Amino acid sequence: MSGRRWGKSLICQVITCLESMQGKRVAYITPTYLLAKAFFDELALLMPANVAIPNRSDLTFKLITGGSIRFFTGERLDNLRGLKFHYVIIDEASFIPNLEEGWNNAIRPTLTDFQGKAIFLSTPKGKNFFYSLYLKGVDPSPEWESFKFSS
């Protein structure tokens, strides 16, 4: 958790690049399609052209390492059903409606096959599901870690 313009998204975009270059499947979820498209474009600048093949219409990257990156919106979390990932990044999680239901029914099951990991990041917006996840890491629950930075 941190304020605006701190660099959370950039850090997670770098993590996305590194994980996918190791042959892993990564999902990157944003609250809106517009933000997913903007992050796709930013990631296209980070990914070496000889390593990743971008598909702008599907908002995906296929890597020569066997890894992949797929962007999704929080508006349609059911689109993740039936898929599997090593890593899921949920950016601006506080702004995704019905995130708790989406996490339990659509996102979390995608991590089961690979015993994958998820990163939730956001600018705070009240005491919603993102806040309850943040408290799990403060608790500290052994499966959760939380970080807080000022802008």
Q: Where do the language-model regions lie?
A:
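Phosphate/NTP-binding elements of NTP-utilizing enzymes
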Residues: M1-S151
